[in-house]
Swiss-Prot record:
Presence of keyword Zinc-finger: yes
Keywords: Metal-binding, Zinc, Zinc-finger
Protein name: Zinc finger SWIM domain-containing protein 3
GO molecular function: zinc ion binding
Cross-referenced PANTHER family: SWIM-TYPE DOMAIN-CONTAINING PROTEIN, ZINC FINGER SWIM DOMAIN-CONTAINING PROTEIN 3
High-level lineage: Eukaryota, Metazoa, Chordata, Craniata, Vertebrata
Zn finger residue spans: SWIM-type: 531-572
A matching Pfam family: SWIM
Gene coding for it: ZSWIM3
Source organism: Homo sapiens (Human)
Length: 696
């Protein structure tokens, strides 16, 4: 494992990395990562999914001090940073520190002796970021997959460790560690049982932070199962937070998985967490065989198959199948579409394709409990596309941490000690720890350029471009000119009608939406009486005439939103006047000056009397406020406000004076021909100034 070593897929790296860890007798755990799905969604790229991570960091799980649990343990400085290089289309090791410092490690010496003193396993490499080796071809990169280079100072261990039981001394050590765990973390809980043969049968534990997490998010519970080479079983209990990120709330280790042990494990979980009756849904792996016991322990909860685990199962079955590469590629696309752009058609398509790679019993089981489970997919879809990506990525991170640590330990004792030492480490936000790269300038994809879309009905998309080195810091005007020049000629006049007939604010708001459309990949599909428009976000329904949309922007402002603009962009149509609410159109707006005053103040008689002048100002202010109120509504709400205003005017005018709502007095200018732009002409005698005061 050297700096600059390249790997075609993440599985290739994982194979070499596992061999490296076995050879050097060290354990690493995933710390930070940015998944390919997360990167593709946020940057509009199409990186291969077998890359899995565009950037991932692994750190040594061991500490520099003894195993006594402290709040801030000194971690071993060894780590590895793996990155994806787009030009090579390869993963490569960009940073590597192989200096291990383990305060309690027993490393075999070349002579075969062991020592309890602190040892350092060092490689003849310097820690420095590097770029992958580039040559005319990738022979060297491919060769590194077959013949990886390891450190010179190695410790030879058996690739298949012998099964080890828990001795009485080990039990005493575990009891001591758990006692210290409960003492240091106030509010933590632990329980273990010993069988007749004086072997550990079960261990359950959770920290105080885990308890708090379950109290806050008890509705959805997920069981993740891991089995190591010795046959021991680990169950991780996970919940979803409000961002739909997975968090571990409980661990349970079983020597053997039986009806009795699983029932006891679930019972201990309910004893530790008094809010267990609030659990509404429990998600399980398709291989979980104790659904009846789970239903008995959680009688009010629904037991559903986990979308995450079933998806990973289908991916594994597809990878191991003998299907041709083209079918595998199509099924991967179908699986991705079913999970992230869920629809009845996409699920039906995936179900049909899965029949070719699954045995009959498994296919029938998934067809009955996964493909056709309406509740499962309803819960999944209602949280939106972005939440689905966050959910899958966070589960990737957490399950990778749990599985790698549990499977890599040489003994169950070491595994338990490591899990207790780093119990709260599994809930770190690795997905968001890495810095976000600066955004690149984007441009709309020309209509003639083909689109690499995930959906067959994709119409248009985006491509990312970077400026030359000498133009990395253009001023705002240069950027604006460049972006405008990249708009296709057929779309230049798209907003002209809105710019000419609408207000400046309406044009600005709508133009912002148009910029989003230009810089996005949008999917347009017919959906009965409406058109589904999606910009890599929650889909919304747009009327066929383009006058309404279900998104919050259009509902609030009554302006063409990004979804309407995407529909117009697809059909090569401009924004029409009917798509803009009257309150944004110039001919309906009250003509006010820059400071809110009436444009033509000369038409208001200046009598020189402060009382009457003050009343004129009050009438103008009232007219302006009423105009604003009425311009903010349309349809039934406008009629209701208009009716209320007429009643107020009738009451104000008094029984002896009929309402003059539709009369146009000469003292005030009706610029919009609307019934609310009016003013009552003052007579010579006039009313006392006090009668002009209107309380509201």
């Amino acid at each position: 494992m050297e700096l600059g070593s390249c790997f075609k897929t993440y599985e290739d790296f994982k194979e070499c990395f596992s061999a490296y860890k076995r050879e050097n007798r060290c354990s690493f755990i995933l710390r930070d990562c940015v998944s390919v799905r997360f990167h593709n969604l946020n940057h509009g790229t199409s990186i291969r999914e077998d890359i899995l991570y565009v950037q991932v960091k692994f750190v040594c799980i061991r500490t520099q001090s003894n195993r006594k649990r402290t709040r801030e343990a000194d971690m071993c400085p060894a780590y590895l940073l793996l990155r994806y290089n787009e030009r090579l289309d390869r993963l490569f090791i960009s940073e590597l520190n192989t200096q291990h410092i383990h305060g309690d490690s027993k490393v075999a010496s070349p002579g075969g002796d062991t020592t309890g003193k602190s040892q350092k396993t060092m490689c003849l490499q310097r820690l420095q970021p590097v770029q992958p080796t580039t040559k005319k071809d990738l022979d060297t990169a491919e060769k590194s997959l077959v013949e990886p280079s390891f450190c010179l100072d190695k410790v030879q261990v058996s690739s298949k460790p012998e099964q080890e039981g828990i001795t009485p001394s080990d039990l005493a050590k575990i009891a001591k560690v758990m006692k210290n765990f409960l003492k240091v973390d106030e509010g933590s809980m632990a329980s273990f049982s010993v069988g007749d043969s004086q072997h550990l049968d079960r261990l359950s534990f959770q920290s105080s932070k885990m308890t708090d997490l379950f109290i806050r998010f008890p509705e959805n519970l997920l069981l993740h199962r891991v089995e190591n080479t010795q046959g021991h079983i680990l169950y991780a209990f996970l919940v979803e937070n409000k961002e739909r990120e997975s968090r571990v709330v409980h661990f349970a280790v079983l020597k053997a998985e039986t009806v009795t042990s699983v029932a006891k494990m679930l019972s201990i979980f309910t004893e530790f967490n008094s809010d267990w009756p609030k659990v509404k849904v429990v998600f399980v792996d398709p291989s979980f065989h104790y659904r009846a016991i789970l239903q008995e322990i959680f009688p009010a909860a629904r037991i559903l198959l986990s979308i995450y685990h079933t998806t990973r199962l289908l991916e594994k079955k597809l990878h191991r199948s003998s299907a041709n590469p083209s079918f595998k590629r199509l099924m991967k696309e179908a699986l991705r579409e079913a999970v992230f752009v869920t629809s009845e058609a996409s699920l039906k398509n995936l179900c049909q394709m899965s029949q070719a790679v699954l045995d009959e019993d498994l296919f029938n089981f998934l067809q009955a409990h996964w493909f056709t489970c309406e509740l499962l997919w309803y819960m999944h879809v209602r949280k939106g596309l972005l939440a689905c990506n966050t959910y899958m990525d966070s589960l990737d991170i957490v399950t990778s941490k749990v599985s790698s640590l549990f499977r890599e330990q040489q003994s169950l004792l070491d595994c338990i000690l490591c899990f207790v030492d780093y119990i709260d480490f599994f809930n770190t936000k690795g997905l968001k720890n890495l810095p976000t790269p600066p955004p690149k300038l984007k441009r709309a994809r020309p209509a003639s350029m083909p689109l690499k879309s995930k959906k067959a009905f994709g119409i248009c998309g985006e491509s990312l471009t970077s400026l030359p080195a000498e133009e990395t810091k253009p001023d705002a005007q240069q950027v604006q000119v460049q972006q405008q020049s990249q708009v296709p000629p057929s779309q230049v006049g798209m907003l002209d009608t809105l710019h000419q007939s609408g207000s400046e604010l309406a044009y600005k708001l709508c133009h912002n939406e148009w910029e989003v459309v230009q810089n996005s990949t949008h999917l347009v599909d017919m959906a009965g009486s409406s058109v589904d428009v999606q910009l890599l976000e929650d889909s919304h329904q747009v009327s066929k005439d383009g006058c309404s949309c279900s998104c919050s922007f259009q509902q609030w402002y009554h302006l063409p939103c990004r979804h309407i603009l995407a529909l117009l962009h697809t059909s090569q149509q401009p924004v029409g006047e009917a798509m803009v609410c009257r309150r944004w159109q110039k001919k309906y707006q009250y003509l006010l000056g820059p400071n809110g005053e009436l444009q033509d103040r000369g038409m208001v008689p200046n009598t020189g009397q402060p009382e009457k002048q003050g009343r004129n100002d009050m009438i103008q202010d009232l007219s302006r406020e009423l105009a604003n109120l009425l311009m903010q509504t349309e349809g039934p709400e406008l009629e209701e406000r208009y009716s209320t205003l007429r009643k107020i005017v009738d009451i104000w005018a008094g029984p002896s004076q009929p309402s003059e709502l539709f009369q146009q007095p000469g003292d005030f200018k009706d610029v919009g021909r609307l019934p609310f732009l009016w003013g009552k002409q003052e007579e010579g005698e006039g009313f006392p100034p006090a009668t002009a005061v209107m309380h509201y």
